[in-house]
Regions:
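Secreted glycan hydrolases and related glycan-binding modules that recognize and/or cleave
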Residues: 150-151, 170
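Short, tryptophan-glycine- and acidic/Ser/Thr-enriched carbohydrate-recognition patches
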Residues: 165-177
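Loop/turn elements at helix/coil->beta-strand transitions in domains of secreted/extracellular proteins
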Residues: 80-83, 158-162
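Glycine-centered flexibility sites
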Residues: 91-94, 159, 171
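N-terminal helix-cap/turn-to-beta initiation motif at the start of protein domains
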Residues: 152-158
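Non-catalytic substrate/cofactor recognition surfaces at enzyme active-site rims
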Residues: 1-150
Length: 177
């Protein structure tokens, strides 16, 4: 599903597009308004996720611009130790930031055709890919574990109010220290 505009945002976008007429958008507001109307019209898309295996090498594919963090999640948990993640295969559904990225903002989190999938899309796509990797390998995914190495210890010694381990696999979580 796409993150479609609410009625207030849609009304604003439609009014702005009516005023604009047939000319190309002149500014970011007009471009954003055009994107909101497009998301409203499309509502949803089909995201094709695939996995294949060649010997002991696994390949997971997504039709999105997959973040490095997502690729690392897939590689870390893949049942096969040699795993590649290919993006923009069989489609171009735009950026899929992990849910925690939405809290940080940025152009890749704006609801538009190039990043309009719902906020939960990344964990759902990741889970689908892992399930497919299990199917093609005939093995269960590997479990991950947090390390307690010197870098982690130095963070704790600094006495942060909260910290983010950057190894969480299913969404945003700040841990009180």
């Amino acid at each position: 599903k796409y993150r479609v505009p609410n009625q207030q945002l849609l009304a604003w976008a439609q009014k702005l597009m009516e005023e604009k007429g047939d000319r190309a958008p002149k500014n970011s507001q007009e471009s954003y308004a055009r994107e909101q109307i497009a998301l409203h019209q499309q509502q949803s898309t089909e995201v094709v996720v695939q996995a294949l295996r060649i010997g002991d090498i696994a390949i997971a594919t997504t039709p999105t611009e997959t973040y490095a963090l997502t690729g690392l999640k897939l590689k870390l948990q893949s049942p096969l130790p040699k795993t590649m993640v290919l993006d923009l295969t069989n489609g171009a559904d735009g950026y899929i930031p992990p849910p925690e990225q939405h809290h940080l903002g940025g152009y890749n989190t704006w609801p538009m055709r190039g990043a309009g999938l719902e906020i939960s899309a990344e964990p759902r796509i990741t889970e689908a890919a892992l399930g497919l990797l299990e199917n093609v390998s005939g093995k269960l995914r590997r479990t991950s574990r947090q390390t307690q190495g010197p870098d982690f210890q130095s963070v704790l010694e600094a006495g942060p109010i909260a910290y983010w381990r950057l190894d969480e696999l299913a969404g945003p979580l700040a841990i009180d220290s």
